[in-house]
């Protein structure tokens, strides 16, 4: 895959598109001249051109005829614009172009209806894709040939670890869990950073402790294939009790419990709010996680 000239045309210039651009170009060394962006906002297109050395334009007739892969990378609030945008480029799309959607909640059936006769697939990645530490999955359309799947695998594995799924229903479940855990993990880290600062630690030290602890827990559980209680990491009751007392004092236990006990419909509603919030935050400061206002 790396040895092939592989043009990728993105429809959409928001956060979803930039996650891919940043990771593939800056972290994985993919050539910028293989990336093209079609967006509605001229200033945003100019920003992406300068930032990633790609070509970007508001002219939806440009670049499409060069595409090996067309990536639907439209942010959630703009999903309703997709049919009109596709209509502008339909007669320019190469007949063998792969249609690849990273737009949340846009079903395979909708993609196949917009691009009849084309191989189609959906990809899902979490926000850690920006550092190449994501976990993601994909599903393919009914008529999509198997020889196109390496493209999806390549894109996901460039940004993290691939999870195999059987169908779109399982794809949706995996995606929901990934984003729900993303939200709860960031909230938990935020809680611990704020508590550490209240206890008198510097913000830099607080952040280092919180992030390294979460990283270490993940690695330990993955390598041991155990849950925390089987690993017997709570054997020191005095230390454990002190930790729980600290959590109770600052209301952290209640906050984290509420997150993890959310029913599915609440998780989905929160995901939509999180995506919209991420988009708004992204407009202020690209890829800078602000834990404190």
Task: Tell me what each language-model feature is.
Residues 1-5, 208-293:
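NAD(P)-dependent Rossmann-like dehydrogenase/reductase catalytic/cofactor-binding core
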Residues 110, 114-119, 135-173, 180-222:
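Internal alpha-helical scaffold of NAD(P)-dependent oxidoreductase catalytic cores
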Residues 3, 20-21, 36, 51-52, ...:
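Rossmann-like NAD(P)(H) cofactor-binding subdomain of soluble oxidoreductases
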Residues 1-65, 195-199, 283-293:
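NAD(P)+-binding Rossmann beta1-loop-alpha1 motif at the extreme N-terminus of oxidoreductases
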Residues 41, 104-106, 125-129, 170, ...:
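Glycine-rich beta-alpha junction loops
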Residues 172-176, 230-231:
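Short pre-catalytic strand/loop immediately N-terminal to key active-site residues, enriched for Gly-Thr
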Residues 15, 43-44, 77-80, 106, ...:
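Short alpha-helical
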């Amino acid at each position: 895959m790396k040895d092939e000239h592989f043009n990728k045309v993105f429809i959409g210039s928001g956060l979803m598109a930039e996650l891919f651009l940043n990771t593939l170009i800056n972290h994985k060394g993919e050539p910028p001249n293989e990336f093209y962006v079609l967006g509605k906002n001229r200033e945003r297109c100019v920003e992406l051109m300068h930032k990633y050395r790609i070509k970007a334009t508001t002219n939806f007739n440009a670049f499409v005829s060069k595409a090996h892969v067309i990536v639907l990378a439209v942010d959630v609030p703009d999903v309703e614009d997709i049919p009109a945008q596709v209509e502008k480029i339909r007669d320019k799309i190469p007949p063998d172009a792969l249609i690849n959607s990273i737009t949340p909640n846009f079903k395979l059936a909708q993609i196949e209806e917009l691009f009849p006769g084309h191989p189609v697939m959906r990809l899902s990645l979490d926000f850690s894709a920006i550092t190449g530490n994501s976990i993601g999955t994909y599903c393919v359309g009914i008529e999509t040939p198997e020889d196109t799947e390496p493209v999806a695998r390549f894109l996901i594995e460039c940004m993290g670890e691939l999870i195999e799924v059987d169908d779109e229903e399982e794809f949706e479940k995996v995606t929901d869990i990934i984003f729900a855990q993303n939200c709860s993990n960031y909230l938990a880290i935020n809680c611990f950073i704020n508590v550490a600062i209240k206890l008198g630690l510097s913000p830099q030290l607080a952040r280092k402790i919180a992030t390294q602890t979460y990283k270490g827990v993940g690695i330990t559980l993955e390598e041991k294939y155990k849950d925390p209680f089987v690993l017997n990491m709570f054997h020191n009751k005095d230390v454990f009790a002190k930790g729980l007392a600290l959590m109770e004092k600052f209301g952290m236990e209640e906050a984290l419990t509420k997150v993890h006990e959310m029913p599915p419909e609440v998780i989905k509603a929160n995901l939509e709010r999180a995506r919209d919030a991420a988009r708004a935050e992204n407009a202020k400061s690209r890829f800078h996680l602000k834990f404190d206002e």
